Each structure stands twice: as structure tokens, then as C-alpha cells.
């Protein structure tokens, strides 16, 4: 880790020096360079501002002096990135055509503008420059295809909004990042930045420092500590690919830099239960406690090494998830994000609470130790059960905890009966999110949530791997419970040991054939109706774990030991096949 602390000082880079550092101009002689330097115009381009749009006349080229720019195709995808020394717009000038793509500043930048007429005159007089331009055209054609992977964040702003000093936390984050690559820290004295009166002073003073740090490091942490001043805070927000905001007060301040709402944000929570209005204001992609575990998880997200675990629904078979988690964690696999549907949602919430595998398994045993949670049958008006036992068990397990206050990432999936939409729960009550996700239609009453009527997400997405894989911060392990269906032969309303006589079976079902009880039929229907997308075709899937739960009844929660062992065995096999899961 390297740290840069400096005072603002105007750089004053002259045009001749800047142009000489451009690769395509390296072969022109000093006289031509001097003549060109007298015609260029220096411009400051604020962060997020467009330098030009697709379809505009190609009336000039630009040489990047500082900052970072991206080329954006008319369809919206980014296909190239430009930094100090790169030229922008030269191909359009040579072709005499309109701009084929737009260019936008990722952060505050400085460019030198060369008029099209000036550049074409020089091009005709300099054969070596023509060769350089041909090479540049070939490079641009290679880069014009859409990128298959998201660009990783490199400049990370760390902002303190209250009285907590950022420096110790920045050191902890940088130390955690050092295990993944090289990290630099730019943290000028607060008494210096707070005294600056003009924003352009900061751009001039720190652009070169930031460019140099970015070229020689994997990540750069730019720090706006308490008392650093509003201009510096805005500068940090403008330069950053992502922001880390320190939360040390219950409610967010009235004034939050507008750029903070335009960048992906991670929260570091310095208090146990910040108000959800922080999430309303900043819509963070993740939140982490201000401790070593939280700093490590944040560093893994920044580095793209944050591992997710997504788990399928499956009734009692979902107890296998606890065995999978035990085997993975005991082998040293670190998991930061959890998500699932139905029984997978229960396991995800337990793990996101911060329980280790032993505690989670003990809690699962307690969860099923009493009477059957689905044993409060009633007149089937909205469901076969009242749902009261399920409500009490879920509330007793998760209490009033909010998803915003969980130490690890979590989501669950339910389905809205009103709209038919998939609902992804990332905010609000953990108990409510779990309860909605396990509300098997016809068996457990649905959940009212405002205008929504929520039921088990297995109807639409029993293994929401696509939801987890949409997060670009790391790979994903999937636990798939789909197996051959082996129906039981009893009646769901009778004890399993009771085998109904043929006459009674015929009276109740209209057939002599043994049919599965209604509950099993409903759960199996979920497997058939849910998405059958090929998990291996999804991006970022690191492993697919498939416990053999075919001999476990979907409603037989007393088979917990068999389910746990099935999970352990499947995870053990995955680790043997892919030892790189341990990082």
C-alpha cells in the first residue's frame, strides 16, 4: 500500500509536453510539434459530462491530458476506455464522417482539442503519422465489440459524513485489498483541502497524482475525511468508480453530494442499527459492519472476489443447505452473500445473520424439534393450514431484524399473485421476507404486503441463481435440490405409519392406486413449474452442488440428519473437484 499526501499545486502542463507524450505523435519532428502546440485548446471536462455524442460532426480530435473517458456505442454499451496520452475522435476526422460513438468522462479530466483541419493538414505532411493512425484504427476495430465482463472499479472514494475519522478504516480496507493486489491511498490533509476556494484548483492539483496512482496500482482509495470540505468531498465523489460511505449517525445528513447518488455505494456501518433512510437516500449495493470481517468483505467486493451462495427451495430437503454450508466453511471457503427461495430463503437468512455452521444447524434442529410446522390444519378456505405455527417459528427465529442490519448480504424471492411478478426482497423485515418466500399456495396462507399478495417464490424461480449472478462482484455457488420424485404412499393428514385400507383410499381418491398427498403434489409442482435454465450457462457460476436428497420426503423434517449428511457429501465432492473454491 502506498499513501500520497500533498497540497494543491497548479500543474500547468504545457501543450508541447502533453502532445509529445501521445503515442501517435511520437514520430513527428520538433518543428511540426511546435506548430501543432500553438493551435490546440485546453479544456476541462467535468465528471459524467459528454465530450461528444454519436452522430455529431467530427470537427476535432482530443488528446487526454488527465482523467478517464469511455467510448459508448449508440446501443449503450461501453467498448473502449481512454486515459492520459490517448487520442479521442481521430478516426472520425480521418474518415470525414459523423461520430460513430459518444465519449463520456468517467471523472474530471483535461483534454487538448485539435481542430479537424489542423490535424488533417499535419497528417498529409507526415507519412509516419499515417502509419501510426492505421495501427490505431486496427486497435479500435478490435475493441469495438461489447465487453463480455464488467469493468472492475479501480478508484474508490471513501467519505466520512459525520464525526468518525476515516483514516483508520481506510488503512483496514487497504490492508484487506493488499491481499488481492496493489493499493494506493490519496489522503491530503483536511486543513489543506478545506481551505481551497475553487474546484478547478483541485482538478489541476490532483489529476496527475490520481492518474499516476491508477497506472501503477490495482486500486486507488481517495479519502474525504471529516472536515475535508465540501469541494474536496465533491471532487472525491466525481473521481470515483464507487463510493464507500461511513455511517456513524442514525440518520443521513440533510446535504448529500448529488454525485453520491450516481455512483455504486457501499456502506460501512459504525453503529448497530442505522435508520433505513440511509438506504432510501443512497441505494447501496452492499453494507458492512465496521470490523475486520466487514472490511474483508468490502475488499473482496471491490476486488471482484466476493463469493455468493444461492440455494433452492425443496421443503425438508432444504435442510441439506445447512450441511453444505458446514462443509464449505470448515474447509475455509468464505461466503459473503446469500440468497434463496423457500427453504433456501430460511437457510440464507440464518447464514446472513452471521451464524456459524454449528449454530445454524442447532437452530435448525430447534426449529423442527416441536410439532410439525405444517400441522395446524384448518378448513381449506385460503390454505390447508392456518399458518400460525409457521408465523411463530419464523418470528422466533429471526425476530424483528431488518435486512438492512444483517452483517452479510441477503435476498429472498417470492411471487406476487396480483401481478405475476417475481419479487426480490432486499429491504425490510427478515421475517417478512422469509415468510413470503415459504408461503406455498394452497398449503400456507399468502402474505399481504401493501398491494402485493405474496406466495412462495418457487412458482417462478426456485433456484434464483440468475438474481445472484447479476451481482458482478464475484462468483456464485449454486445448491440445486432437483431430484427424481419419489412420492410417499400415505395420506398427508394421517401419520406416515398409517396405511389407509383400499376401500378408504378408493372413497377418498376415486382410485385404487397410491397417490401422493396434496402437500407433496404442490411442492413437486414447483419443481416442474420453476425456471429450468441451464445453470452452467449463467455468468460467474463457480460451482453447482447437487445433494442427493431423493430419499428424503419433501415434508419429512425429521430426516434432518440424512439431509445434513447429503449436503456435506455433495459439498465435499465439489471441493475435491474444485479446490480453488478455498481462497
Curated annotation (Swiss-Prot):
Residues 309-469 form the PNPLA domain. The keyword Lipid biosynthesis does not apply. Transmembrane segments: none annotated. It comes from the Bacteria. GO terms for biological process: lipid catabolic process; phosphatidylcholine metabolic process. The keyword Hydrolase applies. A motif (DGA/G) lies at residues 456-458. Keywords: Hydrolase, Lipid degradation, Lipid metabolism. A motif (GXGXXG) lies at residues 313-318. CDD domains: CAP_ED, Pat_PNPLA6_PNPLA7_NTE1_like. It holds the Pfam family cNMP_binding. A motif (GXSXG) lies at residues 340-344. A nucleoside 3',5'-cyclic phosphate binds at residues 24-140. GO terms for molecular function: lysophospholipase activity. The active site is at residues 342, 456. Gene3D superfamilies: Cytosolic phospholipase A2 catalytic domain, Jelly Rolls. PANTHER family: NEUROPATHY TARGET ESTERASE SWS, NEUROPATHY TARGET ESTERASE/SWISS CHEESE D.MELANOGASTER. Belongs to the NTE family. This is Uncharacterized NTE family protein MT2641. It comes from Mycobacterium tuberculosis (strain CDC 1551 / Oshkosh).
Amino acid at each position: 500500500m502506498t499513501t500520497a499526501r500533498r497540497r494543491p499545486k497548479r500543474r500547468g502542463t504545457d501543450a508541447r509536453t502533453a502532445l509529445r507524450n501521445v503515442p501517435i505523435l511520437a514520430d513527428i519532428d520538433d518543428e511540426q510539434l511546435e506548430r501543432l502546440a500553438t493551435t490546440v485548446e485546453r479544456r476541462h471536462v467535468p465528471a459524467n459530462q459528454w465530450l461528444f455524442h454519436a452522430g455529431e460532426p467530427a470537427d476535432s480530435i482530443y488528446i487526454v491530458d488527465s482523467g478517464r473517458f469511455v467510448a459508448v456505442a449508440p446501443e449503450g454499451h461501453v467498448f473502449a476506455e481512454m486515459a492520459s496520452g490517448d487520442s479521442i475522435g481521430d478516426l472520425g476526422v480521418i474518415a470525414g464522417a459523423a461520430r460513430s460513438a459518444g465519449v463520456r468522462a468517467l471523472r474530471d479530466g483535461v483534454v487538448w482539442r485539435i481542430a479537424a483541419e489542423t490535424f488533417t493538414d499535419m497528417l498529409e505532411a507526415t507519412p509516419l503519422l499515417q502509419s501510426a493512425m492505421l495501427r490505431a484504427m486496427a486497435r479500435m476495430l478490435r475493441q469495438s465489440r461489447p465487453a463480455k465482463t464488467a469493468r472492475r472499479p479501480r478508484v474508490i472514494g471513501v467519505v466520512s459524513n459525520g464525526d468518525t475519522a476515516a483514516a483508520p478504516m481506510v488503512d483496514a480496507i487497504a490492508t484487506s485489498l493488499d491481499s488481492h493486489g496493489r493499493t494506493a491511498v490519496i489522503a491530503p490533509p483536511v486543513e489543506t483541502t478545506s481551505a481551497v476556494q475553487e474546484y478547478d484548483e483541485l482538478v489541476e492539483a490532483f489529476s496527475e497524482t490520481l492518474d499516476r496512482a491508477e497506472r501503477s496500482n490495482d486500486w486507488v482509495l481517495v479519502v474525504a475525511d471529516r472536515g475535508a470540505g465540501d469541494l474536496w468531498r465533491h471532487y472525491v465523489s466525481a473521481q470515483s468508480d464507487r463510493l464507500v460511505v461511513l455511517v456513524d449517525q442514525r440518520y443521513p445528513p440533510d446535504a448529500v453530494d448529488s454525485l453520491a447518488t450516481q455512483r455504486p455505494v457501499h456502506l460501512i456501518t459504525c453503529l448497530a442499527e442505522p435508520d433505513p433512510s440511509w438506504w432510501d437516500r443512497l441505494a447501496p449495493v452492499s453494507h458492512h459492519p465496521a470490523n475486520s470481517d466487514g472490511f474483508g468483505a468490502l475488499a473482496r467486493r471491490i476486488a471482484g472476489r466476493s463469493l455468493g451462495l444461492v440455494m433452492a427451495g425443496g421443503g425438508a430437503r432444504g435442510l441439506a443447505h445447512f450441511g453444505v454450508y458446514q462443509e464449505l466453511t470448515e474447509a475455509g471457503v468464505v461466503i459473503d452473500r446469500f440468497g434463496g427461495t423457500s427453504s433456501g430463503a430460511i437457510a440464507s437468512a440464518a447464514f446472513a445473520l452471521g451464524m456459524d455452521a454449528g449454530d445454524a444447524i442447532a437452530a435448525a434442529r430447534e426449529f423442527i424439534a416441536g410439532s410439525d410446522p405444517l400441522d395446524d390444519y384448518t378448513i381449506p378456505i385460503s390454505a390447508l393450514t392456518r399458518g400460525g405455527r409457521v408465523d411463530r417459528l419464523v418470528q422466533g427465529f429471526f425476530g424483528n431484524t431488518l435486512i438492512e442490519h444483517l452483517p452479510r448480504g441477503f435476498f429472498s424471492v417470492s411471487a406476487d399473485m396480483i401481478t405475476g411478478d417475481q419479487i426480490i426482497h432486499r429491504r425490510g423485515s427478515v421475517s417478512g421476507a422469509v415468510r413470503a418466500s415459504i408461503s406455498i399456495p394452497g398449503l400456507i396462507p399468502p402474505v399481504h404486503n401493501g398491494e402485493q399478495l405474496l406466495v412462495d417464490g418457487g412458482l417462478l424461480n426456485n433456484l434464483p441463481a440468475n438474481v445472484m449472478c447479476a451481482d458482478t462482484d464475484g462468483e456464485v455457488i449454486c445448491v440445486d435440490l432437483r431430484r427424481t420424485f419419489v412420492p410417499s404412499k400415505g395420506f398427508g393428514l394421517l401419520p406416515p405409519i398409517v396405511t389407509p385400507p383400499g376401500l378408504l383410499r378408493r372413497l377418498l381418491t376415486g382410485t385404487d392406486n397410491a397417490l401422493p398427498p396434496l402437500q407433496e403434489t404442490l411442492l413437486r409442482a414447483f419443481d416442474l413449474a420453476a425456471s429450468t435454465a441451464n445453470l452452467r450457462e449463467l455468468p460467474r457460476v463457480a460451482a453447482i452442488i447437487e445433494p442427493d436428497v431423493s430419499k428424503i420426503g419433501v415434508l419429512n423434517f425429521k430426516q434432518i440428519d440424512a439431509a445434513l449428511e447429503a449436503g456435506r457429501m455433495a459439498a465435499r465432492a465439489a471441493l475435491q473437484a474444485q479446490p480453488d473454491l478455498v481462497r
